[in-house]
């Protein structure tokens, strides 16, 4: 799993959203700008991953994929090894990514006109997903305590209108980087239970944790 973090790879003019669309989206030249606006790394993946992809490519046939037992086994092993979370592989439902999966969950557990709770600031795409689906965003602002974002459930309780059906949680929190504690996650669960909310937990950054912190799956 060795990686070379010193290798500089030029991704400009490769149809890279991160680099080639900076000017179109933000008016910043890709030649001079620093694209810190999206979570997209410029490092090659570990060789074992590239080799596996190349093996599939070299086979030359790209038909429908099935028989995902190895895939599910790998997910089970990683979550147990990394987070001590012993899942049942039957719980896994594969989507086309975070945005697609979150949209599907919101549409499944709410109806047009219902409210969706967000602890803000949060990943901006969630606002678009909710509004385009005909739902209403209810912002529950995090408290910025000298650069440390905190939750205020007494205030959030007062904001609830009664039509909320879903809480979209970012854990670890994007953009602040907060890793929610066991106590905070328990309070979030209690808040959701009080207001009969389905929690949709975005944990895409769960493996990017600084030393001294522990991610706890929701």
Question: What residue spans do the PLM features occupy?
Answer:
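Walker B catalytic acidic pair
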Residues: 203
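N-terminal small-domain helix-loop-helix segment of the aminotransferase-like
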Residues: 4-97, 104
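Conserved core of the PLP fold type I
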Residues: 62-190, 207-208, 212-218
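Short glycine-centered segments of the SAM/dcSAM-binding site in methyltransferase folds
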Residues: 115, 197-198
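Short, Asp-centered acidic motifs that coordinate Mg2+ and/or phosphate
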Residues: 34, 165-166, 198
